[in-house]
Every structure is written in C-alpha cells, then in structure tokens.
C-alpha cells in the first residue's frame, strides 16, 4: 500500500510540472477508403498539426487553437457542439474554461467530475510513453486519427479520435481528441 501511495504521489508531482516535453509522435498505419491518391503530403501536414496540438496541450497553451480550425467548418467538441473560431477564443479567455478543465487541469476536472480518479488529456499524453498515429483517410478531404500509446495502452480509449478536414486545399482540425 505504501509503495502504491508513493508511486501515485510521484506521478502527481510529475504531471503537475509545467516544463515537460511532449511525447514523441510518429506515423503508424495508413488506411485509404475508396481512393488511391498519394497521401504523403497530406499525412505530413496532418502530422505537423497533431504534433503542434499535443505540444500545446502539454504546454497548457491553446492560444493558437482557433487558427487550426476552419473558419467555415468550426470545431466539434464532444457534447458542446460545433464551435466557431470566435467562440473558441471567447471560451479560452474565461478562467476555468472547458479546455482548462478537460485538457489541462486535473484539480478542475476532479471538481467537475466529483471524483479523484480522473485524467486530463495532458495527463494521458504525458503518460503515453510516445504516440503512434494511425491515419484513416475516409476521402481525399477527410481523415480520422487513432492514437496508439507506447505505454499505458488501456488509456487510449479515454481519447476521442481527432478528425481533420481539408478545406480549400488546407487541412484543419474538425474534432478534438
């Protein structure tokens, strides 16, 4: 029991640090549904976007998030619906906002869920040991990602698969993890 408490305390201390590096991210399997277009450029662009999102999550900084969202399509957030760039900026300006609660701050999430047994998206990334990204191209303009953790694989299911759409030749985040 003492060993478990000691490990849990060490993990809590580690996750509370603010100068942590984002986990390594690499391309895994790539699936093409109904088309055979060369996806290398698209895969590189989406990988760069997801690396930035993971780095920003670990850094607790979504100040650039709205720039990664299509002005036309918006961002699908769980049960919150689709948010415009302006709504994202407005939400980020609030203390204790949705992103702080679910993505960054375990204490806020504990209060929200009324439970001690919670993990933020940031926690999941930091405890992943590295992330392999599977790409599921549903068309030439839509791609869903699946995260595969190197460690703590049972926690992968706590994330929603991010979804990207290509609008006017540029890839944008359409659904968060």
Where are these regions (language model features)?
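Exposed beta-sheet edge and beta->alpha loop/turn motif
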Residues: 105-177
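Short, solvent-exposed secondary-structure junction/capping segments
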Residues: 69-83
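A solvent-exposed, acidic/Ser-Thr-rich amphipathic alpha-helical stretch
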Residues: 81-111
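Short beta-strand and adjacent turn/loop elements
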Residues: 69-73, 93, 160
